Swiss-Prot record:
It comes from the Bacteria. It holds the Pfam family Methyltransf_5. It is found in: Cytoplasm. Belongs to the methyltransferase superfamily. RsmH family. One of its GO terms (biological process) is rRNA base methylation. S-adenosyl-L-methionine binds at residues 35-37, 55, 80, 102, 109. The lineage of its organism: Bacteria, Pseudomonadati, Pseudomonadota, Gammaproteobacteria, Alteromonadales. InterPro entries: RsmH (IPR002903), SAM-dep_MeTrfase_MraW_recog (IPR023397), SAM-dependent_MTases_sf (IPR029063). Its EC number is 2.1.1.199. One of its GO terms (cellular component) is cytoplasm. Keywords: Cytoplasm, Methyltransferase, rRNA processing, S-adenosyl-L-methionine, Transferase. GO terms for molecular function: rRNA (cytosine-N4-)-methyltransferase activity. PANTHER family: 12S RRNA N4-METHYLCYTIDINE METHYLTRANSFERASE, S-ADENOSYL-METHYLTRANSFERASE MRAW. This is Ribosomal RNA small subunit methyltransferase H.
Length: 313
């Protein structure tokens, strides 16, 4: 792998440590990326351990060849939202000792201009995690209604000027279609009046389009529910989020399944019955990167790690 596209795994020790790895355990790395977390898991596993990695990026599948000679490792080409299906196909439901998810876009994806994720590098306006299938960002921007664009920018990017930006895109695309990342980034920079300090005006819109094109939040919901299904008792969830939308989903999921079922007041149900409906317990508080890690890797700044454990059935 070229140095240009090298990837530093965020919160590496904390995330893998949170899995509480057993020598003979079976683990899932749902976001293989370039293999940083997988490498750490394999180093801690014994000979009878097993690691199932998942990624929908063809470049990640290619990078997984570095572990081709390790019989404990296998890679699945697909989205982590379908992890329960993959585990069921392998006959391992209820036997998984840990699931690791490193959400969002990876550094190699951001740094490769041809992938179209970054407003700082000019490239095709693509943004697909799996660039072998599905609609590109350019194709969506060419056909989307103003209302739809505004909703995406507001919902997934928390963009205050969502409607104004959507209108300007619609007005400009009739003259010149948005085919390059620079085209879109330059338009947003030009029409944004109240710019945030130390943040490019296109940041939120690019995030929103990426999340929408890849159905990222739906994938997270599906992965969390799937993990709950496949985890063994005392199995661990170790999840890194990079923005508030992701972290909110993870935080609420852990809280909901840690509190047990909510029942109307007055129903004849015992505390023991409520306890039995609890499926998870949070392990400690949310973990943030240290100042030293942020200094080494600026992209770690917004990361949040949450760890939870599957309770007995």
């Amino acid at each position: 792998m070229s140095q240009e596209f090298a990837h530093l795994s965020v919160l590496l020790e904390e995330t893998v440590g949170g899995l509480n790895i057993k020598d003979d355990g079976i683990y899932i790395d749902g976001t293989f990326g370039r293999g940083g977390h997988s490498r750490q898991v394999l180093q801690r596993l014994g000979e009878k351990g097993r690691l199932i990695a998942i990624d929908r990026d063809p470049q990640a599948i290619e990078a997984a060849k570095q572990f081709a000679d390790d019989p404990r490792f296998q890679i699945v080409h697909g989205g982590f939202g379908q992890l329960a299906d993959y585990v069921e196909d392998l006959g391992l439901v209820g036997k998984i000792d840990g699931v690791l998810l490193d959400l969002g876009v990876s550094s190699p994806q951001l740094d490769d201009a041809e992938r179209g994720f970054s407003f700082l590098r000019d490239g095709p306006l693509d943004m697909r995690m799996d660039n072998s299938q599905g609609e590109t960002a350019a194709q969506w921007l060419a056909r989307a209604e103003i209302e739809d664009m505004a909703w995406v920018f507001k919902t997934y990017g928390e963009e205050k000027n969502a409607r104004h930006i959507a209108r300007c895109i619609a007005a400009d695309r009739d003259k010149t279609p948005f085919l390059r990342t620079k085209d879109l980034a330059d338009l947003i920079a030009r029409i944004t009046k109240n710019k945030e300090r130390n943040k490019h005006p296109a940041t939120r819109v690019f995030q929103a389009i990426r999340i929408y094109i890849n159905s990222e939040l739906d994938q997270i919901d599906q992965a969390l529910e799937g993990a709950l299904t496949v985890l063994a008792p005392q199995g661990r969830l170790s999840i890194i989020s990079f923005h508030s939308l992701e972290d909110r989903i993870v935080k609420r999921f852990i809280r909901r399944h840690s509190q047990g079922e909510s029942v109307p007041h007055g129903l004849p149900i015992t505390e023991d019955q409520i306890n039995k409906s609890r499926k998870l317990r949070a392990i400690g508080k949310a973990i943030m990167p240290s100042d030293e890690e942020i200094e080494r890797n600026a992209r770690a700044r917004s990361s949040v790690l949450r760890i939870a454990e599957r309770l007995d059935y």
